[in-house]
Amino acid sequence: MKTTLPISLDWSTEEVIDVVHFFQAIEQAYDQGIAREDLLGKYRRFKEIVPSKSEEKQLFRAYEQENDVSCYQTIKKAREEMEEHIQM
């Protein structure tokens, strides 16, 4: 399955890789689940790259339209629940 990922040409190669890993973690939460701390760690790195809330929303929206997932709901669940494993 071909997935389109929202990336910026302003990001370094390392930043692109880290953003891809974040979006893969979102997918993993929907597929087989992911360790809560792993997901939140990838989100923290994502926020270092994309500190702007409006840019985050744009990237989430672009990704969600292509992949039928909710980045916001996934992160919200990881923050609110104390379970070690997040499954959407």
From Swiss-Prot:
Coiled coil start-end: none
Pfam families (UniProt xref): UPF0223 (PF05256)
Family statement drawn from the similarity comment of this UniProt entry: Belongs to the UPF0223 family.
NCBIfam families: PRK04387.1
The protein's name: UPF0223 protein BH2638
